[in-house]
Amino acid sequence: MYKQVIVVRGDLKLSRGKLAAQVAHASLGAFLRAKESGAPVEEWLREGQKKVVLKCKDKEELLELHELAKRRGLPSFLVRDAGLTELEPGTVTCLGIGPEREEEIDRVTGDLPLLR
């Protein structure tokens, strides 16, 4: 089974619309990286494009997760906001990882809680 995970910073106070847009940026960005890298995109598409949104504590943890994903060879995309609405330009908001095999992504994000 394959999935994509989006990790959102828990310390940012974002409106629902802003959060939805940032998650969409992370999902699409990670998908495009995966497609370029030869990751199993077609399998993920056939299986229904499973996506899971998780929460981390802060920017530092998000950056650590990004580095770990890169070290493990997982396609990933770090979102930096343009600063046109709610946030300062360059604010790191979330991270998209995958699509890739669930067990590979879980090695990076398996301890994180769901975003609720």
From Swiss-Prot:
Pfam families with a match to the protein in the record: PTH2
BP-aspect Gene Ontology terms: translation
NCBIfam families: arch_pth2 (TIGR00283), PRK04322.1 (NF003314)
UniProt xrefs under CDD domains: PTH2 (cd02430)
Catalytic reaction list: an N-acyl-L-alpha-aminoacyl-tRNA + H2O = an N-acyl-L-amino acid + a tRNA + H(+)
Function according to Swiss-Prot or TrEMBL: The natural substrate for this enzyme may be peptidyl-tRNAs which drop off the ribosome during protein synthesis.
Keyword Protease found: no
Subcellular location: Cytoplasm
Family to which this protein belongs: Belongs to the PTH2 family.
GO cellular component: cytosol
Keywords: Cytoplasm, Hydrolase
GO molecular function: peptidyl-tRNA hydrolase activity
The name this protein goes by in its record: Peptidyl-tRNA hydrolase
Enzyme Commission identifier(s): 3.1.1.29
Organism annotation: Methanopyrus kandleri (strain AV19 / DSM 6324 / JCM 9639 / NBRC 100938)
